[in-house]
């Protein structure tokens, strides 16, 4: 596996020097300063590559080229935004980058309710609390029809949760959900968010799939022409939220994506922390079934709680993800590829990390502090080395 590290650009508190010292050789980044839907100029891409090269690092994976909401809703200027996306892909390929991660989540990217959940050892993790989210939907956002998405017990718990909240608590929860987490290119006020939700009225799972299929049929031929590996990121959490459909959550969704545009360039980001939230997602089976389409991996683990829809992010080698078996399955796929002459290792990044040690006293991007990810990378690296020595002695290091 190629060891990579996500970097949010010059404003990221984690520097390129930090990344280099962590042992990563590749950087996963994007041009976050360019608005959604605007073409990425070759000059801007090359400038970012030069910044990385100055520190002996390479831009391994683009994460992400955001998809404009008009494309997801198949409305407004969707055709122009698709053409812009196609040109951005051509420009990325012209600069020698071969992998692009993206997602098709409506409105919000990844979602959490608590960005500072304290663990027993004093470190802090990200958490999704189903009852807190219900309190937001039912009593803060007041989304019509939201009660249909929660059990009677959850609704009672959500009301009690809301009644115990202060104004500061309400503002914090609202901000955590709709203000935009790292990697999300858009944040909203409550009124803006309600208006955006209204744009999805009448768009169910079948319609969103149709809209994504239209996008893929326009994008994948370009990826084939220029040699790009497109790697769709799963929904996080992997289920419908806010009355919005989600269509990249299960192995059945992966099969649909493969069949919709059956090309090796139409692939996946295997995010174990996203898919792994669902107990019915067999991560190893997913890797074994779609191994040739897995172009990028995000390795982390989560811990499901008493309410199975509530979870927090665990240590990389703890929680509900069997990281040993996951890494072994990835290495098995790498060995298969190398036997066929494809020597490109699968890029991997330690996804998220606990805020811990000195980082507890610093301003950090939620989930993306340095020391927690350093720990995660070191742990995964150790698993990989042990597996290679034991089972894959001929696998190119």
UniProtKB/Swiss-Prot annotation:
<comment type="pathway">
    <text>Carbohydrate metabolism; pentose and glucuronate interconversion.</text>
</comment>
<dbReference type="InterPro" id="IPR004628">
    <property type="entry name" value="Man_deHydtase"/>
</dbReference>
<protein>
    <recommendedName>
        <fullName>Mannonate dehydratase</fullName>
        <ecNumber>4.2.1.8</ecNumber>
    </recommendedName>
</protein>
<keyword id="KW-0456">Lyase</keyword>
<comment type="similarity">
    <text>Belongs to the mannonate dehydratase family.</text>
</comment>
<comment type="function">
    <text>Catalyzes the dehydration of D-mannonate.</text>
</comment>
<dbReference type="GO" id="GO:0008927">
    <property type="term" value="F:mannonate dehydratase activity"/>
</dbReference>
<dbReference type="InterPro" id="IPR036237">
    <property type="entry name" value="Xyl_isomerase-like_sf"/>
</dbReference>
<dbReference type="GO" id="GO:0008198">
    <property type="term" value="F:ferrous iron binding"/>
</dbReference>
<dbReference type="GO" id="GO:0030145">
    <property type="term" value="F:manganese ion binding"/>
</dbReference>
<keyword id="KW-0464">Manganese</keyword>
<keyword id="KW-0408">Iron</keyword>
<dbReference type="Pfam" id="PF03786">
    <property type="entry name" value="UxuA"/>
</dbReference>
<dbReference type="GO" id="GO:0042840">
    <property type="term" value="P:D-glucuronate catabolic process"/>
</dbReference>
